[in-house]
Amino acid sequence: MLELIYILPLLCFVYFLFRRFVLENFYVESSGKYVMITGCDSGFGRLLATSLLDKHVNVFAACFTQQGMASLHSEWKLKKGPKGQLYTLQLDVTSQASVDSAKSFVTKILKEQNSKLWGLVNNAGIFSIHGPDDWCSVDEYASSLNVNTLGAVRMCHAFVPLIKKSRGRIVTMGSTAGRLHGLYVAPYVTAKFAVEAYMDCLRLEMRPFGVSVHILEPGCFKTELLNNDAQRMRIQKIWNSLSVETKEEYGEDYRNDFERAWEAGVNVVANPNIGWVVDCYSHALFSWWPRLRYCPGWDAIFMFIPLSIFPTALQDWILAGLYKLNPGPSLTPAVLVKNKKRRSAIQWIQFLSQIAIIPLLYTIFFVKNTQKQTVETSTHHHNVTVSE
């Protein structure tokens, strides 16, 4: 029995190594398969589309803008040699009509090619740093949920029937923010927790149909979503929408410090190697043994994912400490700075009062002692007179 306690963990570790370094390196035939990708204007989606095309995968690349469609198509045409077929389409995942139109387009092409849809990649998403929850209206939450969560739900509802026919794959962009909370990103964290919960439920329901569902949980990567100029504009826009009371509570210095702290943090943490995320996408789509969750990024592997299993109180303590280590300026609302100064002034007054009371106490003690000595002297003289 005692031997089993040592053997079972060892066997589990050996199986983990065997699966990770042997089984996961076997791939299904990807050439000629059809994959639908959302959010191909830039970043992960665009790089994934071009990467799959180089592997002879046929790609339905959904872009939010016509400019994104045109530039991607031009890039594809300039490539020489064997490549997959590119089909570009404009898609707004927040619009059911747009999603339905995309499904009709894809269904038509598949029927013409007598083929099936192998993969759906829910890559479209938005990220915007809004600031404290006091700055966020319900609209900020609704906007984040509508793209990051409901956008994926709409796409799954539309395309899952096509994926079932091929017993294919659904891969969705989550985030470490879907596992762990943080400061100043409540709308984004809320949406990512929600979309990961949806995918976890969908994964169980799709098992009988032979469809596998996978989630990517990357750390911080340098993409257009983290563009400093765009973030400055968002911060200024939301600041302008705040009430006078809220602006006075936080102060203009806080707004400026928040902007600088955000940029400093991103420059330190963000990983420029976005190919890491694209490789995870490809593995989830075509590996014989894909993982249910992928966590690209050193910050995800060594900090955020391990931290997500800690007790909540310890998570809060560590996260608060990490934010204090931010290379940017510290963030303290104006009202707390005033209160701190007021408390400091009161403490100084109390301290000075305590110092000032010492001479007073000494004086009282001296006077009382003098009076006592005077009384004792008078009594002594009185006693001497009586004796005579």
UniProtKB/Swiss-Prot annotation:
One of its GO terms (biological process) is cholesterol metabolic process. GO terms for molecular function: oxidoreductase activity; steroid dehydrogenase activity. Belongs to the short-chain dehydrogenases/reductases (SDR) family. It catalyses: lathosterol + NAD(+) = 5alpha-cholest-7-en-3-one + NADH + H(+). Pathway: Steroid hormone biosynthesis; dafachronic acid biosynthesis. Its EC number is 1.1.1.-. It is an enzyme of class 1 (oxidoreductase). It is found in: Membrane. 3beta-hydroxysteroid dehydrogenase that converts 3beta-hydroxysteroids to 3-ketosteroids, an essential step in the production of dafachronic acids from cholesterol. Catalyzes the dehydrogenation of lathosterol (5alpha-cholest-7-en-3beta-ol) to lathosterone (5alpha-cholest-7-en-3-one), a step required for maximal biosynthesis of Delta(7)-dafachronic acid. Dafachronic acids act as ligands and bind directly to the nuclear hormone receptor (NHR) daf-12, suppressing dauer formation and inducing reproductive growth, they can also regulate C.elegans lifespan. It is a multi-pass membrane protein. GO terms for cellular component: membrane. It holds the Pfam family adh_short. Strongly expressed in the hypodermis and posterior pharyngeal bulb and in a number of unidentified neurons of the head and tail. Keywords: Cholesterol metabolism, Lipid metabolism, Membrane, Oxidoreductase, Steroid metabolism, Sterol metabolism, Transmembrane, Transmembrane helix. Disruption phenotype: Mutants appear normal at 20 degrees Celsius but have Daf-c phenotypes (formation of dauer larvae at low population density in the presence of abundant food) at 27 degrees Celsius. InterPro entries: NAD(P)-bd_dom_sf, Sc_DH/Rdtase_CS, SDR_fam. The active site is at residue 188. It comes from Caenorhabditis elegans. The chain crosses the membrane at residues 2-22, 300-320, 346-366. This is 3beta-hydroxysteroid dehydrogenase dhs-16.
